[in-house]
């Protein structure tokens, strides 16, 4: 039997709420979303205005499956108390991290800027850029060397002088989390026949593997029979904010 146009128009996929930003499409499966995408942005979306996000192209992606709860991954991301013992290579690129500090605002008396070390061009295995520096960046953004945007609960973006790395997080089970890391570069870099992003990819993979190891150790510790609760160090105020954000979600 032939169907009418009206009947076929009603046979589409179920509608979902979606927002396009920065070259990504974000989906919210809630029937009536209570939170808009930008409301969870930390800091505001404008922090990445000088990066040409919409035109960047994917050079490489890597999928990890971590044996930990998704909240443990975020707790690890939101502090650098673990950095000196876990990320020695990263601490050489960002001296502030040697002080167990994620940002200079945690301890202004440290007198160490939240920026890459002198002579460092980018987050790569040899500290040198693997692509042309984005011409739209300010001198301060180039000097800092890394600008972060956090989009709880599913993504953070690390913007560097020559590339952008975005990390997406998805819970699979109560103790398993999928993490997808993507390295994005300008079309000009991608069109260059000599372009080789491997040093940026290798460095990002190193950091994520180090984080995965401590996250999985933490998960196993939560299963220890004597465990009741943990304690936050003074440097972990962002973790406290995360706990309060999550508790707020659970109370609504």
Segments and roles (model prediction):
Residues 1-27:
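Short Fe-S-cluster ligation motifs
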Residues 17-252:
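C-terminal catalytic domain of Rieske-type non-heme iron oxygenases
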């Amino acid at each position: 039997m032939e169907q009418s146009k009206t009947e076929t128009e009603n046979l589409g996929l179920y509608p979902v709420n979606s927002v396009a930003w920065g070259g990504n499409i974000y989906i919210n499966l809630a029937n009536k979303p209570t939170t808009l995408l930008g409301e969870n942005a930390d800091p505001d979306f404008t922090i990445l205005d000088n990066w040409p996000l919409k035109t960047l192209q994917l050079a490489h992606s890597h999928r990890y499956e971590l044996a930990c709860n998704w909240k443990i991954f975020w707790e690890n991301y939101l502090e650098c108390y673990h950095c000196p013992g876990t990320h020695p290579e990263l601490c050489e690129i960002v001296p502030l991290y040697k002080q167990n500090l994620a940002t200079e605002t945690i301890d202004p008396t440290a007198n160490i800027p939240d920026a890459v070390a002198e002579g460092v061009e980018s987050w790569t295995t040899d500290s040198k850029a693997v692509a042309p520096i984005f011409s739209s960046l300010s001198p301060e953004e180039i000097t800092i060397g890394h600008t972060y945007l956090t989009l709880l609960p599913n993504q953070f973006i690390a913007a560097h002088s020559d590339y952008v790395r975005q990390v997406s997080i998805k819970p699979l089970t109560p103790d398993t989390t999928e993490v997808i890391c993507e390295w994005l570069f300008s079309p000009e870099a991608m069109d260059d026949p000599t372009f080789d992003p491997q040093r940026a990819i290798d460095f990002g993979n190193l950091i994520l593997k180090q984080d995965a190891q401590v996250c999985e150790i933490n998960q196993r510790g939560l299963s220890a029979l004597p465990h009741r609760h943990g304690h936050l160090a003074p440097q972990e105020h962002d973790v406290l904010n995360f706990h309060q954000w999550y508790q707020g979600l659970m109370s609504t």
